[in-house]
Regions:
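Ferredoxin-like iron-sulfur electron-transfer modules
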Residues: 346-370, 404-429, 448, 452-461
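N-terminal export leaders
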Residues: 11-31
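Short, acidic/polar
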Residues: 89-103, 151-165, 217-225, 301-305
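Beta/alpha (TIM)-barrel catalytic core signal, keyed to glycine-rich beta->alpha loops juxtaposed to Asp/Glu
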Residues: 13, 53, 179-383, 387-406, ...
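Conserved, mostly hydrophobic/aromatic
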Residues: 59, 71, 111, 126, ...
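N-terminal secretory signal peptides
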Residues: 1-11
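C-terminal segment of N-terminal export signals and the immediately downstream linker at the start
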Residues: 31-70, 83
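Active-site groove signature of glycoside hydrolases
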Residues: 166-184
């Protein structure tokens, strides 16, 4: 194995052993249909595509001119290291470099990562790719992701490791990562003095903008905005047309409320999950019919991005772009962004109604619930269930003409998508995953429902 690669892997292994792997994200770019057919691919793109000028927003706090489209590095391309006896998966750095170069070339200047993304390798890959460019040509965002070990010593180690991995001496946008309730916030940032440390780092110039990402209850959001005593430079919220007026799981606040509070306080909103974990890029067939009737040439993803981008207090919108065609489709939307008109907004209300009819599981595929101590592949199980449901190929009615075909596709596709030992019937209901889910999904309960559904299908010939 190449010495640099080996040292990199060993270093990140030690780091992730210390801080946990609760946000394992990445994989090899596997796309699986309801029937379980796989499609692994390398980047392909049309070289001569032309785009207009990227849309930019000015931060009212810092004056930064930020591209409305941001590159989220939660998932990056992987490759098999053929020089390794273990044939380990490693980040495909050459591919990452190409993606970042292409994005920068076309006006994207905001890049978001975390110490726990991509099995702990995202910051390093991001640093290698971006350090090849002048530092004043991009804004760099990372996070204090001290979920597993919130001690002061370990949190400080995580902070300093980020600078080393990212090859920088300052971070433009630093986030308190995924806070949603007071006790966890108190343990991770107040009791250990880390919040005071980060505020001091901002005064020293090593952090240019300090903010936080929110997953939680209304009371905690209100505390952070009105009672925390901190003047935040930005807040990252989950916002999309489905969440705008809808509350999910056991959360009690919608995106409209979050956005309007930030707008009134003149705090810029950074947007995560504009596609709801990819579900809005490929919604159910009824939703797609509504969109295609109005804009037959536009992708479903573009509708979701335009919804978020039409809101004036949005500074930037994160998108994970593992392939250059993803970047190109987004560039068509953001270069420049065309705000939604009234008829399009009305159509999206109809789309939301169809999505509520389908009763999908609200998993976004963030992988924060992983790894399961019993090996259950939680995101893959939910993805397969939702995929079959939203494709209109769900075997819930034995009297349906398509039932036998749909039943076969569901069962065969499940075995192709998820190894049998990692399926829902092996969940023991320990609940260790539940506190880590930003969507507040009652995961053991959903696993039980899916297991019962699968067993029912197996007994119905």
């Amino acid at each position: 194995m190449n010495t640099d690669i080996k040292n990199s892997i060993d270093s990140r292994r030690k780091f992730m052993k210390l801080f946990g792997g609760g946000a394992l994200a990445g994989g090899a770019g596997l796309f699986i249909s309801c029937s379980g057919e796989e499609n692994k691919r390398k980047t392909a793109f049309i070289k001569d595509m032309k785009f207009g000028e990227m849309t930019y927003r000015i931060s009212p706090k810092s004056g930064d001119k930020v591209s409305l489209l941001a590159f989220g590095a939660m998932r990056l391309p992987w490759m098999i290291n053929e020089n390794s006896p273990e044939k380990e998966e490693i980040i495909d750095q050459e591919e990452v470099n190409g993606l970042f170069d292409y994005a920068l070339e076309h006006g994207v200047n905001y890049f978001d990562t975390s110490p726990v993304y991509c099995r702990g390798f995202s910051e390093e890959a991001t640093g290698k790719a971006l350090s090849r460019h002048p530092r004043d040509k991009y804004f760099l965002a990372t996070k204090m992701s001290n979920f597993a070990s919130p001690s002061r010593e370990d949190s400080l180690a995580m902070y300093h490791e980020s600078f080393k991995a990212l090859k920088t001496d300052y971070i433009d946008y630093y986030l308190i990562h995924a806070v949603g309730e007071y006790e966890a916030y108190k343990e991770r940032y107040l009791d250990n003095g880390i919040l005071d440390f980060l505020i001091a780092e901002k005064k020293a110039g090593r952090i240019r903008n300090l903010g936080w990402s929110f997953h939680g209850e209304k009371d905690f959001f209100d505390y952070m905005m009105f009672e925390s005593g901190v003047e935040w430079d930005f807040v990252m919220i989950q916002l999309n047309y489905f969440d705008w007026e809808t509350t999910q799981g056991v959360t009690n606040v919608n995106a409209k409320y979050l956005y309007e509070v930030l707008e009134k306080k003149k705090v810029p909103a950074l947007i995560m999950e504009p596609l709801l974990g990819g579900r809005l890029a490929n919604p159910n067939y009824k939703a797609q019919e509504i969109m295609k009737r109005i804009n037959p040439e536009e992708s479903c993803a573009s509708w979701a991005f335009r919804f978020a981008g039409s809101l004036p207090n949005v500074l930037t919108i994160l998108s994970g772009m593992m392939y250059k065609e993803h970047i190109q489709d987004n560039l068509k939307t953001f270069s420049p962004l065309k705000p939604l008109n009234d008829s399009e907004k009305k159509a999206l209300s109809q789309v939301v109604s169809t999505m509520l009819e389908f009763k999908s599981i609200i998993c976004t595929g963030c992988n924060y619930c992983m790894p399961c101590p019993y090996g259950i592949d939680i995101p893959a199980i939910f993805h397969h269930y939702n995929k079959c449901l939203e494709e209109g190929n769900f075997p819930d009615n034995p009297q349906s003409e398509n039932y036998k075909k749909a039943r076969h596709a569901f069962l065969v596709g499940l075995d192709r998508s998820v190894p049998k030992l990692r399926q829902a019937n092996h969940c023991i209901g320990c609940g260790k995953c539940v506190p880590h889910c930003p969507q507040k999904i009652r995961i053991p309960k959903e696993m039980q429902k899916i297991d019962e559904f699968v067993e029912k299908l197996k007994t119905q010939a």
